[in-house]
């Protein structure tokens, strides 16, 4: 495909990295022949067009986030406070009908855009695979570009992987899951691609390259005339959804496909966004296929939103489940809102990993998954997330047994009772205890996750759970909150206050434990010490950084030719 408007007249510039690029685009990532098939001149022109058209609106949206943060830090509370959009909240309107290809989304599997993962996930028996450029991926140049190559091969049906260690070749089955792609959030830059001298917006790179190369094959092979399909993360306001809607419309126009072809599910994973669900769906009404409970990031956002409110300390994060009043209210309101507007209400993640060496523990873990999924389906959710193929049969069984033969519950479960959920319901303080073990677990998991992320892995199995960046974020902000306000511990640490000294002792103990668990050799070779410094610096910062990954990103940026400055 080629832009008629650009043709062959657009100036070609060869950068030091060896890629042919249009005017104003500079690539600082390593040259690779396979990457060059993705980073074509026309594809880069499309990304540059998106960047130039939307960069000022993106900047404004990020500034608005900062203003909202200042208001919350001054004591304001988030709420349904927008009189200008009252007509949207109270009006009777629906989103465009759900495409038949994705009517049934009972179980969705998620994972990074790695080659073997993509094949296994598409073959897993799940209805949908969400391929992730966001929290499950460390956004190194190699990971991002290989991910684009892998997705192109997956959409074309040609993807295969030879596992030399097992001498096994992985290929796609005849029946595969529908593919959704999650680009990065608005706040993350792509430092390896400069447009007019500035780093590109990460999500526009992820979306633009994937859409440009795959929309035609996707609509033919996967979407039955619709698509491509996306998941959109980390939004805090409907103005951000409006930008995405405009991006989709521009992409559809460029490709010459009908308006409303592209479809997206928005993750409601920030506290401000829960008060904007109607508005978010309204902005995307021609392109929406629902909302999803991104519950781990939602808890992280709760702490971040109330960072200047010492009266809202979170209990141990393991106690902040969906039965907490503010979490249940969020889930119920999401179901009611989605079904009222005619779209899917997706449940949250089951992060458990099968425990192969302990059948009793494995059985108990699966029972927890079943219980959680039963709660979701009875609450009216149309589907759910799983992090591991081994969980899919259990999740599918629970949803299928409780939904009859219907693909979803959009008409069957209106949840009118949730219409009365108040602002107070959505921000009610969570109940529970704060323990020394909670502080230890946060520290142990946060450091290990960050060490993996710095060495290129964004989806990390830890203590029988598949963890992504959301877990590290909760761990970090909770430690920060407890330290900032000198929280008094319960349980074993009864009466002990969280101080710099206590955190220092905990870090020392947990680093020794990590070394014992992973072994001296791996500990020495890994980036545990660097991760520890970064994690402790974040926990002890006088003001809370918005995102751990934003702070850590410069550590994985490698500019070519070597010696180019980092951001």
Swiss-Prot record:
Descriptive protein name: Malate synthase, glyoxysomal
PANTHER family attached to this UniProt entry: MALATE SYNTHASE, MALATE SYNTHASE 1-RELATED
NCBIfam families: malate_syn_A
EC number: 2.3.3.9
GO cellular component: glyoxysome
Gene Ontology MF annotations: malate synthase activity
Residue ranges of the motif Microbody targeting signal: 565-567
Example GO biological process: glyoxylate cycle
Family listed: Belongs to the malate synthase family.
Alphabetically ordered keywords of this record: Glyoxylate bypass, Glyoxysome, Peroxisome, Transferase, Tricarboxylic acid cycle
Residues at the catalytic site: 182 (proton acceptor), 468 (proton donor)
InterPro entries per the UniProt record, alphabetical: Malate_synth_C_sf, Malate_synth_sf, Malate_synthA, Malate_synthase_CS, Malate_synthase_TIM, MS_C, MS_N, MS_N_TIM-barrel_dom
Catalytic reactions of this protein: glyoxylate + acetyl-CoA + H2O = (S)-malate + CoA + H(+)
Annotated Pfam families: MS_C (PF20659), MS_N (PF20656), MS_TIM-barrel (PF01274)
């Amino acid at each position: 495909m080629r832009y008629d408007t650009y043709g062959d007249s657009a100036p070609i510039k060869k950068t030091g990295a060896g890629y042919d690029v249009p005017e104003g685009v500079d690539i600082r990532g390593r040259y690779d022949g396979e990457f060059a098939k993705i980073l074509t001149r026309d594809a880069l022109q499309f990304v540059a067009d998106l960047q130039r058209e939307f960069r000022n609106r993106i900047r404004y949206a990020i500034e608005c986030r900062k203003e909202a943060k200042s208001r919350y830090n001054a004591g304001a509370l988030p709420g349904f406070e927008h009189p200008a959009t009252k007509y949207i909240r109270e009006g009777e309107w629906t989103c465009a009908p759900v495409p038949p290809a994705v009517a049934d989304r009972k179980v969705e599997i998620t994972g990074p855009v790695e080659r073997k993962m993509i094949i296994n996930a598409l073959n897993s028996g799940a209805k949908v695979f969400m391929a992730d450029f966001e929290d499950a991926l460390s956004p190194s140049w190699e990971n991002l570009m290989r991910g684009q190559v892998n997705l192109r091969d997956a959409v074309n049906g040609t993807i295969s992987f030879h596992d030399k260690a097992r001498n096994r070749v992985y290929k796609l089955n005849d029946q595969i899951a529908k593919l959704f792609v999650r680009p990065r959030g608005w706040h993350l830059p792509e430092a390896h691609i400069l447009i007019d001298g500035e780093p590109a917006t990460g999500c526009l790179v992820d979306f633009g390259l994937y859409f440009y190369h795959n929309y035609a094959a996707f609509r033919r092979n996967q979407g039955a005339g619709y698509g491509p399909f996306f998941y959109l993360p980390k939004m805090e306001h409907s103005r951000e959804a409006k930008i995405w809607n405009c991006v989709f419309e521009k992409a559809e126009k460029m490709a010459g496909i009908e308006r409303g072809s592209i479809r997206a599910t928005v993750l409601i994973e920030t506290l401000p966004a829960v008060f904007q669900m109607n508005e978010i769906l309204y902005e995307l009404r021609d392109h929406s296929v629902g909302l999803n409970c991104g519950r781990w990031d939602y808890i992280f956002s709760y702490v971040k939103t109330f960072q200047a409110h010492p009266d809202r300390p979170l209990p141990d994060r393991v106690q902040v489940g969906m039965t907490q009043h503010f979490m249940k209210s969020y889930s119920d309101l999401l179901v009611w809102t989605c079904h009222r507007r005619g779209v899917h209400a997706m449940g949250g993640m089951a992060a458990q990993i099968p425990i192969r060496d302990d059948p009793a523990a494995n059985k108990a873990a699966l029972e927890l998954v079943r219980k959680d999924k039963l709660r979701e389906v009875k609450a009216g959710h149309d589907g759910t997330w799983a992090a591991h193929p081994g969980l899919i049969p259990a999740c599918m069984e629970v949803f299928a047994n409780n939904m009859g033969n219907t693909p979803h519950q959009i008409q069957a479960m209106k949840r009118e009772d949730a219409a009365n959920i108040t602002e107070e319901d959505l921000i009610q303080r969570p109940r529970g205890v704060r323990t020394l073990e909670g502080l230890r677990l946060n520290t142990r998991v946060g450091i290990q996750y960050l060490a993996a992320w710095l060495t290129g892995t964004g989806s990390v199995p830890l203590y029988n759970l598949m963890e992504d960046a959301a877990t590290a974020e909760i761990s970090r902000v909770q430690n920060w909150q407890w330290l900032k306000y000198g929280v008094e511990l319960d349980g074993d640490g009864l009466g002990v206050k969280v101080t710099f000294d206590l955190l220092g002792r905990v870090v020392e103990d947990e680093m020794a434990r990590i070394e014992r668990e992973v072994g001296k050799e791996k500990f020495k070779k890994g980036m545990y010490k660097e991760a520890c410094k970064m994690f402790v610096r974040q926990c002890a910062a006088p003001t809370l950084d918005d995102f751990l990954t934003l702070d850590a990103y410069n550590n994985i940026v490698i500019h070519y030719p070597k010696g180019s400055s980092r951001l």
